[in-house]
Amino acid sequence: MQNDIEERKSDLMTDLWYKGKETRIKQDKQEKRVQMKNIVIFGAPGSGKGTQSDLMIEHYGLEHISTGDVLRSEIKKGTELGNTAKGFIDNGQLIPDELMIDILASVYDSFGRSHKGVIFDGFPRTIPQAEALKKMLDERGDKVAAMIELDVPEDELMKRLIKRGQESGRADDNEETIKKRLVVYHQQTQPLIEWYKKEGLHHHIDGLGTLERIFADIKSIIDNL
């Protein structure tokens, strides 16, 4: 009889330990979700997206994932994912979403579990990519906290980009090329903006004004996440 009681006590203690562990894991995940502020930033060429991303990195200590930079880095390092991506690029093909997500996941995981959040710049560009990003983060107990759209009127974007082209001598910053780039940007992002609105994550920022005022608007969003 005594042995039976002791066994039941032991089983109960074991059960309580496992339940406690599950609760702690769940709490850790919830805390991580609260602490991490993963931001998707949208902005047409010339919107000041790069400048505002730099300010967010400096102020909040966020990591930054720019798809263009990541691809160049992976290819330069000769990683398996980079070499696979290079094969598609060399053949004039688009990089499949699955491969792009694998590359982003690899970079995201390299930050460890103590980072404060990530700015996703240049990704997603399509709704399937947004869904894949959501799934990738969810598998890690994380999520996109906000999608921030820097909205600048097209005539102002044209002025900024033409001026930039004149100052830098960039041939791709002529008026005709700029118009094409802006058309492509709006075609790509409008469905995504609607998708993020449905997710309750879309935040609109007026991209006209001083850097300080625009960043103050961004801070008011991030500080209340």
Feature map (PLM): residue ranges:
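Glycine-rich phosphate-binding loop of ATP-dependent small-molecule kinases
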Residues: 3-225
